[in-house]
Design a protein with these regions (language model features):
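N-terminal type II signal-anchor transmembrane helix
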Residues: 2-35
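Short alpha-helical segments used as structural interaction elements across diverse proteins
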Residues: 3-4, 60, 146, 187
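Hydrophobic alpha-helical segments, especially transmembrane helices
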Residues: 7-8, 64, 191
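A structural signal for short, hydrophobic/glycine-enriched beta-strand patches
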Residues: 24-181
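A transmembrane-helix-recognition feature enriched in membrane-embedded lipid enzymes
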Residues: 174-201
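Hinge/cleft segment of the Venus flytrap/periplasmic-binding protein
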Residues: 205-207
Length: 207
C-alpha cells in the first residue's frame, strides 16, 4: 500500500512539473509582434484598476509613464488609453490620461477609451478608435506578465502590432512579480489548449 502511494505521489509530482514546464514554454514562446515596424500610428496603453481613492495604482502608473516615454521618443504621435470602470467606479482610461497630461502630453494627442471591461475589450475598442482615425498600426503597452496573453488576443487581428513592456513598479517584491507571471502563464497555457471563450469581441476581430 505504501509503495503504491509513493508511486502515485511520484506520478502526481511529475504531472505537476510537466504542467509547469509546458506553461513556461508556451508563455515564453508567444510572439511579441507581427511586424518589423519600429514606429506606429498610435500607442495603446492597457488599463488596470486605479486605487480606491481614484489615484493611479502602481501598475497603472508604470504603464502610463512608459506610454508617455514611448510617445516622447517618437514611437507614435498619439496615445490611446483604454479601460472602463471595470473594478471600481473610476474609469481607468481617464485616470491614465490625467497622469499623461501632467507629464506634458497634450490632450490633442490622447484618446480615451472608457468602455472596456477586460483585455479582449481593450483591444476591440481600441481597434475601433484606430479605424475611426485611419490609424493602421499600434504599439501596445502593458505590464511584463500581461503581454503574452495580450499577444494571444492581438493574434486575432491583422493590423501591424507590437507589444512593449512597462517596468515593474518599484514597490513590487520579487514574490509579487513571480505570482503575476505564474497566474498569466497558467492562463496562457489554458488558452493555447482550449482557446478563448466565445465572445462577440473576438468574433469580429478580423482586421
Amino acid at each position: 500500500m505504501a509503495k503504491t502511494l509513493r508511486k502515485l505521489l511520484v506520478i502526481v509530482i511529475a504531472l505537476i512539473l510537466l504542467a509547469i514546464v509546458a506553461g513556461v514554454v508556451v508563455y515564453e514562446t508567444i510572439p511579441s509582434s507581427n511586424t518589423a515596424l519600429t514606429h506606429f500610428d498610435t500607442i495603446i496603453v492597457l488599463g488596470t484598476p486605479a486605487e480606491p481613492d481614484g489615484t493611479p495604482s502602481p501598475e497603472q502608473r508604470e504603464r502610463t509613464l512608459e506610454g508617455v516615454r514611448e510617445y516622447k521618443a517618437g514611437i507614435a504621435p498619439t496615445l490611446i488609453f483604454t479601460g472602463g470602470p471595470a473594478h471600481n467606479q473610476f474609469v481607468e482610461a481617464h485616470v491614465m490620461a490625467i497622469l499623461a497630461e501632467s507629464q506634458g502630453v497634450p490632450a490633442t494627442a490622447i484618446v480615451e477609451e472608457g468602455r472596456a471591461q477586460n483585455t479582449i475589450q481593450n483591444i476591440f475598442y481600441s481597434r475601433r478608435i484606430m479605424e475611426e482615425h485611419n490609424w493602421n498600426s499600434a504599439e501596445v503597452v502593458s505590464s511584463p506578465s500581461h503581454l503574452p496573453r495580450t499577444a494571444l488576443i492581438l493574434e486575432h487581428y491583422s493590423f501591424p502590432w507590437k507589444t512593449h513592456a512597462a517596468p515593474w513598479p518599484a514597490e513590487y517584491s520579487l514574490w509579487q512579480r513571480a505570482v503575476h507571471y505564474t497566474v498569466e502563464a497558467e492562463s496562457c497555457l489554458k488558452l493555447r489548449i482550449f482557446g478563448f471563450p466565445q465572445s462577440r469581441f473576438l468574433l469580429h476581430a478580423t482586421n
